[in-house]
Amino acid sequence: MGFTDETVRFRLDDSNKVEISETLTAVYRSLEEKGYNPINQIVGYVLSGDPAYVPRYNDARNQIRKYERDEIVEELVRYYLQGNGIDL
């Protein structure tokens, strides 16, 4: 199956927004406590899908794996845009 030149709509369920935000915060704190650079580790996980970027410490690995990576990216983009004055 090839790519098309037409725009495709991508929409995720809004029900996980708060949960994803809370999970990212908890994972960030766990990474920080273990001495990792949390941003680098979360980006590594989101880009690769390799859970080894997130430690098992405080159940962080299982927490972040509850969500699809595209859901995490959507929440990060939404948060960034809202923080920069975009009304979504």
UniProtKB/Swiss-Prot annotation:
Signal peptide: none annotated. Coiled coil: none annotated. Transmembrane segments: none annotated. InterPro entries: IreB. Pfam families: IreB (PF06135). PANTHER family: UPF0297 PROTEIN YRZL. HAMAP family: UPF0297 (MF_01507). Belongs to the UPF0297 family. This is UPF0297 protein SAG2091. It comes from Streptococcus agalactiae serotype V (strain ATCC BAA-611 / 2603 V/R). The lineage of its organism: Bacteria, Bacillati, Bacillota, Bacilli, Lactobacillales.
